[in-house]
Design a protein with these regions (language model features):
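Hydrophobic alpha-helical bundle architecture
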Residues: 38, 283-290, 294-296, 306-372, ...
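Early transmembrane hairpin of solute transport permeases
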Residues: 31-131
Length: 431
C-alpha cells in the first residue's frame, strides 16, 4: 500500500519528468544553457564556447532544429543566444522566426561558436556553455544529469549559483526517499483518485496533435505516412496495430525533422514521450476503453518509463525506445484487462526482446526504432494476456520483474559503455 507521502512524491516526479518539449532535447538542452548564459552576460555574446559530453554530441549531430530547416548544434546554440528564453525550459526556441534564423546563420558564418568534446566528465549528460562579450565580460552555465538541471552559473568568474547535485557521487534515483518498484508503479496508476492523475492527459493532447500535424508535411523518412498509404495498409491492413505504428511514426517523423511541433516528453526525451503515449491512446480509442481506463493506462506507461530511466540515466548507449515502449506495453496490457501479473509478463517479454538496441544519435531514422519498439510492445502485451512470458531460465530474465529491470539497466548503463564510445567514433569519423 502506497503512503500518502509516496503518492505526492510520485505526482511531483511525473510532473517534473513529463513536460512539453520543442525539438530534440539534446541540442535544445545546449540552447537552453546558451540562453541562460546570455541572460547572465546581459548582452549578445561575441563568442560562445560549448563543452559537451559524448552523448550530447552524439544525439545532436544529425537532428533537425525546429523552425530552421537545419540540423545540428551550431544553429541551436546561435538561436539560444539570439532569441532563447531560459524560462521556457525545453521550449526555449519557441519564439524562433525566419529573421532569427538568418541572423543565426550569420552568427555561424562569422565563426563565433566553438563546440568541444569534454572527455574529462563522467556525466553522460553534461553541457557547459561560456559566453564572451566584446568588452571582456563572460558568463558560464552548466547543465548536468537532466536536460533542464542547471548545476552551475557564474559571471566574470564570480559564482552565482551552484547545485550540490552537480558534483560528487551521481544520484540516479531521485525523489528523496522514494524507492519505486513496478508494483508501486502499477498500484499508483490503477488506484489513485482519478482527479489527481488526469494531468497526464496533456500528453495525449500534445502527442496526438503532433501525429496529426505530421500529415500536413513531408518529414524525415515519411515512415508514418508510408504506413498509412495503400502499400502499408495492403500489407498491415486497417487495424489497431497498424494505426499504433503510423501514429507513433508520424509524430517522430515530424519531431526529428525539426518541425515546429511541441510534444510531451518523458525523462528528457520527446521520442520517449511519443512512445509512451501514442500507442496507448490509439489502443484505448479503438478498443473502446473508457476515459478513466485511458488515463490510468497513460499514467502506467509514463511512470514505468520514468522508473526504468531513473536507474538507467537520462542518456545511455541503450535506445530510449526500449524503455518507453516497455511502458506502453504495460499500458496496453492494462487496457486489455490485464492484471499486475500480466503486466510483469509484458515487461519481461519486452526486456527479452529489445535489450541491446543501440542509440546512435537522434535523427530522422529514430522513427524506425520507435515503430520497432511499439510493435514489440503490442506483441509482448498479447503474449502476456495469454499467460506467456519469457522465463527465468532464458537469458537475462529473472523471476523477479524488478531484478529483470535491473539487469536491463546494468547492460544499458554500464556494459554498453564501450559500444557507446565506438558508435560516437564511427559517427564523427564518417567520410
Amino acid at each position: 500500500m502506497l503512503s500518502s507521502n509516496e503518492c505526492q512524491q510520485i505526482i511531483a516526479l511525473v510532473k517534473r519528468q513529463v513536460v512539453p518539449a520543442m525539438g530534440c532535447t539534446e541540442p535544445i538542452c545546449v540552447a537552453l544553457a546558451t540562453s541562460r548564459a546570455t541572460e547572465e552576460l546581459g548582452c549578445r555574446p561575441e563568442r560562445i564556447e560549448a563543452y559537451l559530453s559524448a552523448n550530447i554530441l552524439k544525439n545532436a549531430m544529425g537532428v533537425g532544429i525546429p523552425g530552421t530547416g537545419m540540423v545540428g548544434l551550431p544553429i541551436a546554440i546561435a538561436l539560444g543566444a539570439l532569441i532563447g528564453r531560459s524560462e521556457y525550459g525545453l521550449e526555449v526556441l519557441k519564439n524562433c522566426t525566419p529573421e532569427a534564423v538568418e541572423e543565426g546563420k550569420a552568427f555561424i558564418k562569422e565563426e563565433r561558436i566553438g563546440i568541444h568534446l569534454n572527455e574529462a566528465t563522467q556525466e553522460k549528460l553534461y553541457v557547459e556553455v561560456v559566453c564572451h562579450s566584446a568588452d571582456g565580460h563572460s558568463a558560464k552555465v552548466r547543465i548536468e544529469r537532466e536536460h533542464t538541471r542547471f548545476t552551475y552559473v557564474e559571471k566574470d568568474g564570480e559564482e552565482r549559483f551552484r547545485s550540490d547535485l552537480g558534483a560528487g557521487e551521481e544520484t540516479k534515483n531521485e525523489g528523496g526517499d522514494l524507492q519505486l518498484t513496478l508494483k508501486k508503479v502499477y498500484d499508483f496508476a490503477t488506484t489513485m483518485p482519478l482527479a489527481e492523475i488526469e494531468f497526464i492527459n496533456e500528453a495525449r493532447k500534445l502527442n496526438e496533435a503532433a501525429a496529426q500535424r505530421s500529415l500536413d508535411g513531408n518529414y524525415g523518412h515519411n515512415l508514418g505516412k508510408a504506413l498509412s498509404r495503400p502499400l502499408g495498409r495492403g500489407i498491415l491492413g486497417e487495424s489497431i496495430f497498424s494505426h499504433i505504428l503510423s501514429s507513433t511514426g508520424l509524430a517522430c517523423d515530424a519531431r526529428m525533422a525539426g518541425a515546429m511541433i511541441p510534444v510531451m516528453s518523458n525523462s528528457g526525451s520527446g521520442n520517449q514521450g511519443i512512445c509512451a503515449t501514442n500507442p496507448v491512446v490509439v489502443f484505448a480509442k479503438e478498443n473502446h476503453n473508457t476515459a478513466e481506463e485511458m488515463t490510468r493506462a497513460l499514467m502506467l506507461s509514463h511512470l514505468t518509463a520514468i522508473y526504468i530511466k531513473q536507474n538507467l540515466g537520462a542518456l545511455s548507449a541503450l535506445c530510449g525506445c526500449v524503455v518507453a515502449a516497455t511502458g506502453s506495453s504495460c499500458g496496453i496490457t492494462y487496457l486489455m484487462g490485464g492484471s499486475y501479473e500480466q503486466v510483469t509478463f509484458a515487461v519481461k517479454n519486452m526486456i527479452a526482446n529489445l535489450t541491446g538496441m543501440i542509440c546512435d544519435g537522434a535523427k530522422p531514422s529514430c522513427a524506425l526504432k520507435l515503430t520497432t519498439g511499439v510493435s514489440t510492445a503490442v506483441l509482448s502485451a498479447m503474449l502476456a494476456m495469454q499467460g506467456n512470458c519469457v522465463s527465468s531460465v532464458e537469458g537475462i530474465i529473472d523471476e523477479d520483474v524488478d531484478q529483470s529491470i535491473r539487469n536491463l539497466v546494468s547492460i544499458g548503463a554500464d556494459s554498453m559503455n564501450e559500444t557507446d564510445k565506438r558508435v560516437l567514433d564511427i559517427m564523427v569519423n564518417k567520410c
